[in-house]
Regions:
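C-terminal catalytic domain of Rieske-type non-heme iron oxygenases
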Residues: 1-197
Length: 197
């Protein structure tokens, strides 16, 4: 099933919106009962790289406990994730499909910059789901995104810091660290704070 989810305006840097999409550590706290839950809060070590041959960021070998990995999920599962960032304002997620565990569901976000601190996020999903109604699939994704929006609109600084001295990451932030390094290497400035104040 292909599900275009429509555009959602967000008062944040377009780069912050992409970075949030890549962050799994917030799942138990922001998407409680859906994409995560306590006490399953640990992010196990995973692999992140800049694939030089295609100039993309890839995060692989990610596993995370999810109470409801998709609308089609009937029980909690250990979900496998792979993230791909082919462009600064585009990210693609391949994740375990609950009804077909050997296959991937695909969720993508295309972020349209409006200003350096405002954007429109255009998510879509390609899923194996033969039981859910289209409206239910759309509502499931919109619920998750609206939970994210309240976090995104309150992050400080509003621009995404690219100077590693501006924020102190932890091990679970590895995808963000590599994404920011990749953006800096590409000379990204729009929506970014490039130096410490």
């Amino acid at each position: 099933v292909f599900v275009p989810c429509g555009g959602v305006q967000v008062r944040c840097s377009p780069l912050r919106a992409v970075e949030n999409f890549l962050d799994i550590a917030h799942f138990p706290f922001v998407h409680t009962g859906i994409l995560g839950e306590e006490p399953h809060t640990e992010v196990a070590p995973y692999k992140v790289e800049i694939r030089e041959d295609v100039d993309e960021v890839w995060a692989t070998q990610i596993g995370f406990h999810q109470p409801q990995a998709a609308k089609s999920a009937t029980e909690a599962i250990e979900t496998q994730y792979e993230y791909r960032v082919p462009a600064p304002t585009t990210a693609v997620l391949y994740k375990t499909c609950p009804p077909k565990p050997a296959s991937w569901d695909v969720i993508a976000i295309f972020v349209q910059p409006v200003t350096d601190q405002t954007c429109i996020a255009w998510p879509w999903m390609a899923l194996y789901d033969e039981v859910s109604e289209y409206a239910d699939l759309l509502q499931f994704q919109q619920e998750i995104f609206l939970q994210d929006r309240s976090i995104l609109e309150n992050q400080k600084p509003t621009l995404l810091p690219l100077d590693p001295r501006m924020e102190i990451p932890t091990r679970c932030d590895l995808t963000s660290v590599v994404y920011r390094r990749w953006l800096k290497r590409k000379g990204a400035t729009y929506g970014a704070q490039t130096t410490a104040a």
